[in-house]
Amino acid sequence: MSGLFETLGRRALFAFDAEQAHGLSIAGLKTGLVTGSAPNDLALSVKVAGLQFPNPLGMAAGYDKNAEVPDALLKLGFGFTEIGTITPRPQSGNPRPRIFRLVDDKAVINRLGFNNEGHDAAFKRLSQRAGKSGIVGVNIGANKDAEDRIADYVAGIRRFYQLARYFTVNISSPNTPGLRNLQARDSLRELLSRVLEARNEEGKMCTLKRPVFLKIAPDLANEELDDIAAEATEQKLDGIIISNTTLSRAGLKSAGGRDETGGLSGAPLFDRSTIVLARMRERVGPDMPLIGVGGVDSAETALTKVKAGARSRPALYGPDLSRPEPAY
């Protein structure tokens, strides 16, 4: 019977375009009808970067962009959830349509462009859950027209420091022109230095040290992975999230939509992101936490992520929220 309801629900959502379906799923969670909590099983619990997660499956950024339903997502059983990407000022993102289903590939292409309501709106919503349990991270980004993009990331750290359990620095979206250039070593060195300095200053004032993770692209060459690993290690970054969406279209079967610009996610991202996860583990050694994202849709794919990235410490993994099920 549950399979029937799942099929009917999926068909109903597919009657709308992808972005409308996403909005409807958020609206459904906002009704407050979701009950429950993450499983309280010590066998599933994992400690990473000083945080005790009830289980290692989390909701990646990109679904709850504006911090509208973090607690509803935690009630669904996720061990953590990540809001954003949030930029200092609101921005509308790229023109619609900007999400394209590739049904035969169990994937989508999106070129949203960090559409979000900005720091103020997210801060107000997160303030309303102050004191509640559950790990909610904040994924921070830069406005498209920012003169100093690194300053936007620093602003995100300072604004949300009291409310975020951890931060993700997103420099890997392909939908903001020039953003991925921050992954180059010289730019990355300055970015991490300024962001971690802000984190350390805020931490001293409230005696709390929030972990900072870096989210990278799956399209990096080995030399670029070398540079990122070196900077992350040298600056004592808390962890790396692997990966964002890909620009590759290799092996796609779907005819419609495959030529649209934007980042590809879903099942076709799984192999590429998992390979990069394994390569990064080789570079950073056994101790740095790595978080695997991309194409996770089953226990088997989740376990593969863990095997690729978890040598001596467990890896966290998050479902790729741009895949067509369930949100789109």
From Swiss-Prot:
Chief place of localization: mitochondrion
Cofactors demanded by this protein: FMN
TM segment ranges: 21-38
Catalytic center residues: S173 (nucleophile)
Biological or metabolic pathway of the protein: Pyrimidine metabolism; UMP biosynthesis via de novo pathway; orotate from (S)-dihydroorotate (quinone route): step 1/1
Binding-site residues for substrate, renumbered to this chain: K65, N110, R111, L112, G113, F114, N170, I171, S172, S173, P174, N175, N244, T245
Membrane disposition: Single-pass membrane protein
GO biological process: one example: 'de novo' UMP biosynthetic process
Domain of life: Eukaryota
E.C. code: 1.3.5.2
Subcellular location: Mitochondrion inner membrane
Pfam families per UniProt: DHO_dh (PF01180)
GO MF annotation, one: dihydroorotate dehydrogenase (quinone) activity
Catalysed transformations (reactions): (S)-dihydroorotate + a quinone = orotate + a quinol
UniProt entry keywords in alphabetical sequence: Flavoprotein, FMN, Membrane, Mitochondrion, Mitochondrion inner membrane, Oxidoreductase, Pyrimidine biosynthesis, Transit peptide, Transmembrane, Transmembrane helix
Role description: Catalyzes the conversion of dihydroorotate to orotate with quinone as electron acceptor.
Family classification: Belongs to the dihydroorotate dehydrogenase family. Type 2 subfamily.
Listed PANTHER family: DIHYDROOROTATE DEHYDROGENASE (QUINONE), MITOCHONDRIAL, DIHYDROOROTATE DEHYDROGENASE (QUINONE), MITOCHONDRIAL-RELATED
Protein name: Dihydroorotate dehydrogenase (quinone), mitochondrial
